[in-house]
């Protein structure tokens, strides 16, 4: 390869294991194979490999087989922290100890697994360009050349501008996404590559291309490549130089492919079935060892293998354990040769230790360029997520317009000064909530960042800093828009200096919050815990901003929080900037006032406002700031310096946390710890029945041996299937006598499709496809990106976008009842979407009860077949086991019409794949029609399929018929094709035949192929005019006529779907189980409520009966409502998991009605919200010293429980309406800020503009605040402090009582010294009800409000159902988003077919 010159691994490096006994560390375990404790069926990972001896030379590719392989790869990759081996064994790279080498040169060890994690909104071009930029410090033109050559080699040039996508956002196909992951790994430029099932999801031709490229790169760069592959053809195996075989605990062989076959077949006497490919043969040996079976069973019939000694004597040896095979290996000549080779290398003076100075640096580009490229990528990935970005922008614009108009032209009065303070506080609080909304998307980024940092594209803190740079830039734009609208609508001071100071402080305060909540996401293990931390931080920021509680009134034990709060410094600076030079008119708060006092000189009056002086009808802003709020204008620039200090500190902590604090990225590990915690707390999780005792690894429940099979497969219809004598044992030997599908529908139906076209935008993904499925097992094949998954989705009525044309017929009749059709089919998706906290049995059971006949005995049959212990949690399954569970979920429904499977064997080893296909074959023999996409099928696997439906890229059918006929068909039209029936795999042959014409020599497009092959055959056009196509049409018509003549309606054989109440009961029980086992979520919710209650209660400890106490009371209630925001975020994260499973899998299968999902989540969430809110009430209410009478406490508690119901239903409404979690978080911030603004706390009702007065009655917070405050302050006696008394001087000859009598009669309040003739001391309020009246509240409204609050809860319920319906049933949101994206064009092209 011309690009190999850019790759510089360690020269002539070799990886040597010399008798190594390897202990696996915790970092390496998790996704690998697990052994199970027979007593409790819980996972117990194997933790040691013994006496591993091999040497992989520079430039070699080694195929590693065996269950510990994945764990071994991870152990080597995490060598610094996980690798542990005991002497005298050793592991060396060149002549360096491997652990030392991995510490000094970690970037030389590259690991790639079967998981594909990418930023979904980046295009393929952006993704690859970023990787190249991080690893190669060369001119852009050369990087582009490398990119184009890599994309061309991997067949991705045609998707250059397409977004990558993921399981939930459509982009490139799954196979193409896998190739992107492989390219990234190539680019990592290491010396030792560990490829862990990296061909999962690739078709055989693409997998072969990958191995060819890998071989070229290995030879050219002299790198060492260890590869684990679950399924592979002999052509792929032949690409490897050596094979390493590992059992559970021991090495069984190392050598070339030919040596391996000779050793096991000739030396040990383990026969190889002629129809087995190499990897099937070797995997079967390993599987029999794992099942602790006798390897002799693989020979003719005896449990003993026949061996010849050196003297020619025939002996027998029985293998009872993997140790027996290990013992044979250790005494073999191959083992001695490896030991001699290793010994020779160790004494070879020419092989020197690796000098780190001779190795490329860990990061090939300087930090400055890392930051540049990461920042560019941060802009690209964020701007690509238009839904989230648009939601934030619209939220800011609407909020600024609404709040600006609410505070429209604030008067220059004392009351107006309160409004200015409220506006400042709201601005600060709004951007705090907006920063809080960024936490979900930060958690979603972490797996990608983890992967790329392990590939050493960049150092963690650089990526964090680049994200921070983008966030600051975007938030600055939002602050500018917000400030311009709000500032001038509210008529704050129209002076440039004042405006820019407002903008400056709000911007830098916002930056502080962005970094603070980013830090929270880095130190919290889960988003639930992050919301717990964020909730407490939010309360501290709001309460100790010195506005809710004035600085001088804070309790000494918490006053220090204010000085650690950036909001306090921003609040002081912004408000001081606004009020310092103002003169506030006091006409609205003069004491006394009214007609009686019109002629009284002002020297006898006073302004009832903090900072007022006797005899003045105004208050200077600076006096109000100093006396009322303890603010001073001279602190403005000091505060700016302090905020800068906070910002630097938060950034430094964030960078430190991202670099040195290892977050809990792995969701599976989190769930696994939840399950362990639950088991430690038995009162939270009662024992679920008896342990699974039926599981027996030595037996399968499956195909009965007595089942007769016969005949040929020449017809396209489902015909009796003949297993040849050589295959008969393979097909039946693994199964016992119990039938598995005695209740499967035996009546044959036919599903036919004619001229199916599917178009998304301007791109046609399926082009004029026709075919049919009756009974039988049909393979849907084609190269990656040909449209296989797309066709399955179209036929199964699962597509929700685009335009479908053509006909789909059931028994010759048009498909009309879509719901009945969905219930009659099963569909196994590529993505294994399950609820992690259910057990295997519970997952199967819910599918069986809701979609099947409820046959619980059949659950054990399927579970045993799939080798899945019933009581293990889904969270404890590795990826292979999750795939098996996905198949089981559909099998237990016993689909009566058709079973669709999308790559059911992807990621499974050869033996597991064969087991699954044999099971599918048995289903087909009993009348089940099965349509199945499959990648890389072996010869023995493909032999079980009756027919093949072959697609080429572009979604065009090129053949439909028996596999044997397919090979003849292609050879008859292309005399350059040669098929050897004895040795060639027919599946590989047909893929190669079509692929070579469509993408010759790895080219991406037909146009490129034609430039290399002028005579390329248009197989789709050839098929349309072929005799075989006419026979298909004829057979279709015959089967449709037979089905119509039978008069059997497939809907009559449907299992009776459970009633709505039964569905609700089942799903509610499932939700309860998942919630009960998610201890992180439950404890976080209780801790947040309890911690917030104590924090608020102690902050407002024993509120005094004075004026400040009145203000504290109303803000106490307001802060109690603020807790709802982080609690809603917790609820949404939890609800999202079940929503994703339902939308992506269960809804498409019509498992249960969509309203059941919403109701069940509400039924489980509400009691949890009520009980946790009870903890908040107990902690907060009684700490504040309010009226503790049973009546008051009881009514307050009752209303707070109703508030808990309100915020719970609000959170569910938003998460079930929003397209994703981050957008829902933005909606939460917007709605909270919107409703809280109109409740009368921030802006007195009397100052509401006429237009917005209706919103006071629309806001639910109005009624909650009024109810809570009224309960607290009703009949509450007020005793003003002397500093709160309004001074006044009575007229000559009058006492204070006489002078103030008329005023008090009209406005209330009391005189402290009514008999005095000098200076009067007037208190504004006598009882709390006076304050309530002034705030437009009344205790008499408590029960009226209670009813209105119920109405809001009811509205949330209605909105939740309506929102879900419009978004996911009627799909209004995608249409709206489509309009938005037309206004804001997307850089990526349309998605391609899968």
From Swiss-Prot:
Residues 1-420, 659-1080, 1369-1394 are cytoplasmic. This is ATP-dependent permease AUS1. Transporter involved in the uptake of sterol. ATP binds at residues 782-789. SUPFAM superfamilies: P-loop containing nucleoside triphosphate hydrolases (SSF52540). Keywords: ATP-binding, Membrane, Nucleotide-binding, Repeat, Transmembrane, Transmembrane helix, Transport. GO terms for cellular component: cell periphery; mitochondrion; plasma membrane. Disulfide bonds: none annotated. Residues 33-273, 751-978 form the ABC transporter domain. Gene3D superfamilies: P-loop containing nucleotide triphosphate hydrolases (3.40.50.300). It comes from Saccharomyces cerevisiae (strain ATCC 204508 / S288c). GO terms for biological process: sterol import. Belongs to the ABC transporter superfamily. ABCG family. PDR (TC 3.A.1.205) subfamily. It is found in: Membrane. One of its GO terms (molecular function) is ATP hydrolysis activity. Pfam families: ABC2_membrane, ABC2_membrane_7, ABC_tran, PDR_CDR. It is a multi-pass membrane protein. It comes from the Eukaryota. The chain crosses the membrane at residues 421-443, 468-490, 497-519, 529-551, 558-575, 636-658, 1081-1103, 1107-1129, 1156-1178, 1193-1215, 1224-1246, 1346-1368.
């Amino acid at each position: 390869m011309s690009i190999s010159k850019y790759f510089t691994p360690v020269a002539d490096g070799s990886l040597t294991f010399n008798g190594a006994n390897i202990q696996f560390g915790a970092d390496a375990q998790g996704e690998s194979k697990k052994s199970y404790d027979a007593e409790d069926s819980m996972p117990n990972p194997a933790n040691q490999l013994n006496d591993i001896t091999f040497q992989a030379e520079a430039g070699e590719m080694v195929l590693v087989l065996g269950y510990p392989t994945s764990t071994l790869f991870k152990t080597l990759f995490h060598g610094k922290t996980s690798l542990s081996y005991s002497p005298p064994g050793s592991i060396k790279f060149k002549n360096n100890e491997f652990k030392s080498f991995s510490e000094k040169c970690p970037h030389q060890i590259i690991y790639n697994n079967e998981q594909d994690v990418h930023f979904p909104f980046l295009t393929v071009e952006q993704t690859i360009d970023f990787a190249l930029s991080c690893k190669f410090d060369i001119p852009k033109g050369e990087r582009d050349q490398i990119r184009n050559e890599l994309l061309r080699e991997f067949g991705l040039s045609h998707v250059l501008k397409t977004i990558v996508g993921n399981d939930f956002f459509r982009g490139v196909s799954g196979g193409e996404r896998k190739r992107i992951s492989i390219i990234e790994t190539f680019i990592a430029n290491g010396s030792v590559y560990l490829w862990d099932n990296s061909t999962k999801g690739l078709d055989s031709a693409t997998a072969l291309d990958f191995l060819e490229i890998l071989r070229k790169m290995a030879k050219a760069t002299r790198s060492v490549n260890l590869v684990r592959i679950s399924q592979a053809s002999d052509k792929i195996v032949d690409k490897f130089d050596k094979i390493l075989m590992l059992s559970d605990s021991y090495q069984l062989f190392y050598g070339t492919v030919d040596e391996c076959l000779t050793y096991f077949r000739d030396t040990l006497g383990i026969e190889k079935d002629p129809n087995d490919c190499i990897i099937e043969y070797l995997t079967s040996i390993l599987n029999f060892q794992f099942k602790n079976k006798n390897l002799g069973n693989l020979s003719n019939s005896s449990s003993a293998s026949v061996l010849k000694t050196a003297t020619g004597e025939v002996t027998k040896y029985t293998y009872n354990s993997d140790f027996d095979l290990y013992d044979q290996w250790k005494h073999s000549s191959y083992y001695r040769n490896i030991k001699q080779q290793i010994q020779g290398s160790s004494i070879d003076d020419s092989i020197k230790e690796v000098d780190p100075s001779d190795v490329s640096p860990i990061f090939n580009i300087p930090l400055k360029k890392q930051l540049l490229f990461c920042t560019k990528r941060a802009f690209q990935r964020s701007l690509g997520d238009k839904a989230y970005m648009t939601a934030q922008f619209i939220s800011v614009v609407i909020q600024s317009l609404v709040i600006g108009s609410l505070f429209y032209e604030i008067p220059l009065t004392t009351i107006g000064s309160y409004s200015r303070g409220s506006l400042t506080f709201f601005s600060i609080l709004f951007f705090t909530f907006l920063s809080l909304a960024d936490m979900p998307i930060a958690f979603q980024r972490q797996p990608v960042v983890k992967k790329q940092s392990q590939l050493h594209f960049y150092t963690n803190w650089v990526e964090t800093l680049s994200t921070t740079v983008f966030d600051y830039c975007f938030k600055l734009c939002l602050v500018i828009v917000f400030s311009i609208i709000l500032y001038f609508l509210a008529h704050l001071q129209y002076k440039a200096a004042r405006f820019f100071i407002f903008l400056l402080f709000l911007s830098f305060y916002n930056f502080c919050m962005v970094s603070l909540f980013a830090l929270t996401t880095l130190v919290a293990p889960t988003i639930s815990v992050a919301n717990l931390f964020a909730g407490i931080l939010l309360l501290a920021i709001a309460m100790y901003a010195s506005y809710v509680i004035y600085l001088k009134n804070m309790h000494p034990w918490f006053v220090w929080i204010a000085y650690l709060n950036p909001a306090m410094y921003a609040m002081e600076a912004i408000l001081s900037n606004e009020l310092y030079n103002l003169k506030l008119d006091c006409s609205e708060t003069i004491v006394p006032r009214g007609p009686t006092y019109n002629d009284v000189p002002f020297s006898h009056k006073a302004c009832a406002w903090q900072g007022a002086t006797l005899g003045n009808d105004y208050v200077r802003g600076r006096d109000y700031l100093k006396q009322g709020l303890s603010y001073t204008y001279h602190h403005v620039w000091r505060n700016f310096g302090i905020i800068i200090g906070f910002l630097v500190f938060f950034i430094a902590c964030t960078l430190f946390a991202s670099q040195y604090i290892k977050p809990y990225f792995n969701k599976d590990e989190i769930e696994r710890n939840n399950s362990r915690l639950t088991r430690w707390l038995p009162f939270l999780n009662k024992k679920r029945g008896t342990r699974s005792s039926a599981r027996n690894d030595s037996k399968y429940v499956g195909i009965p041996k007595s089942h007769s099979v016969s005949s040929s497969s020449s017809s396209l219809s489902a015909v009796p299937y003949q297993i040849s004598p050589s295959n008969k044992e393979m097909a039946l030997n693994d199964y016992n006598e119990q039938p598995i599908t005695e209740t499967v529908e035996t009546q044959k139906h036919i599903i036919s499709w004619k001229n199916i076209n599917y178009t998304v935008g301007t791109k046609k993904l399926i082009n004029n496809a026709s075919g049919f499925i009756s009974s039988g097992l049909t393979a849907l094949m084609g190269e990656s990106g040909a449209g296989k998954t797309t066709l399955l989705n179209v036929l199964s009525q699962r597509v929700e976008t685009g335009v479908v044309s053509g006909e789909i017929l059931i028994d010759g009749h048009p498909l009309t009842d879509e719901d009945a059709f969905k219930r009659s089919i099963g569909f196994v998706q590529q993505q294994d979407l399950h609820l992690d906290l259910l057990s295997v049995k519970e997952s199967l059971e819910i599918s069986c009860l809701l979609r099947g006949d409820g046959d619980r005995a059949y659950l054990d049959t399927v579970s045993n077949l799939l080798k899945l212990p019933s009581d293990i949690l889904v969270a404890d399954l590795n990826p292979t086991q999750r795939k098996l569970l996905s198949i089981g979920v559909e099998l237990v429904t016993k689909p009566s019409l058709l079973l669709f499977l999308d790559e059911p064997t992807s990621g499974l080893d050869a033996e597991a794949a064969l087991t699954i296909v044999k099971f599918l074959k048995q289903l087909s023999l009993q009348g089940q029609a099965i349509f199945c996409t499959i990648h890389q099928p072996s010869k023995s696997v493909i032999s079980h399929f009756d027919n093949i439906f072959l697609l080429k890229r572009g979604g065009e059918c090129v053949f439909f018929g028996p596999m044997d006929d397919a090979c003849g068909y292609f050879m008859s039209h292309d005399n350059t094709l040669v098929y050897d029936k004895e040795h060639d795999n027919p599946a590989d042959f047909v893929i190669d035949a079509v692929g070579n014409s469509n993408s010759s020599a790895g080219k991406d497009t037909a146009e490129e192929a034609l430039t290399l092959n002028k005579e390329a055959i248009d197989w789709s056009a050839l098929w349309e005019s072929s005799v075989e196509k006419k026979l298909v049409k004829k057979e279709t018509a015959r089967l449709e006529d037979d089905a119509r003549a039978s008069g059997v309606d497939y809907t009559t054989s449907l299992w009776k779907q459970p009633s709505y109440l039964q569905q609700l009961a089942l799903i509610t029980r499932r939700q309860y189980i998942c919630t009960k086992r998610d201890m992180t979520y439950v404890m976080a919710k209780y801790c947040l409520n309890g911690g917030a209650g104590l924090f608020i209660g102690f902050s407002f400890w024993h509120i005094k009966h004075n004026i400040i106490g009145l203000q504290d009371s109303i803000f106490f209630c307001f802060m109690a409502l603020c807790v709802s925001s982080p609690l809603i975020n917790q609820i949404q994260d939890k609800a999202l998991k079940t929503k994703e499973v339902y939308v992506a899998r269960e809804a498409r299968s019509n498992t249960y009605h969509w309203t059941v999902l919403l109701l069940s989540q509400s039924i489980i969430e509400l009691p949890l919200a009520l009980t946790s809110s009870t903890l908040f009430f107990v902690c907060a209410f009684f700490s504040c010293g309010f009226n503790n009478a049973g009546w008051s406490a009881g009514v307050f508690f009752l209303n707070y429980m109703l508030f808990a119901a309100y915020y719970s239903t609000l959170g569910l409404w938003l998460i079930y309406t929003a397209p994703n979690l981050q957008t829902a978080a933005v909606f939460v911030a917007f709605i909270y800020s919107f409703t809280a603004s109109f409740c009368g706390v921030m802006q007195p009702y009397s100052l509401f503009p006429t237009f917005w007065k209706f919103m006071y009655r629309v806001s639910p917070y109005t009624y909650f605040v009024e109810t809570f405050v009224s309960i607290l302050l009703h009949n509450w006696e007020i005793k003003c402090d002397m500093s709160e008394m309004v001074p006044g001087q009575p007229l000559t000859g009058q006492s204070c009582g006489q002078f103030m009598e008329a005023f008090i009669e009209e406005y209330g309040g009391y005189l402290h010294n009514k008999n005095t003739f000098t200076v009067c001391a007037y208190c504004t309020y006598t009882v709390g009800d006076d304050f309530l009246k002034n705030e437009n509240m009344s205790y008499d409204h408590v029960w009226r409000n209670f009813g209105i609050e119920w109405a809001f809860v009811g509205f949330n319920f209605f909105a939740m159902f309506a929102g879900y319906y419009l978004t996911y049933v009627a799909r209004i949101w995608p249409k709206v988003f489509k309009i938005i994206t037309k206004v804001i064009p997307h850089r990526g092209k349309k998605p391609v077919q899968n």
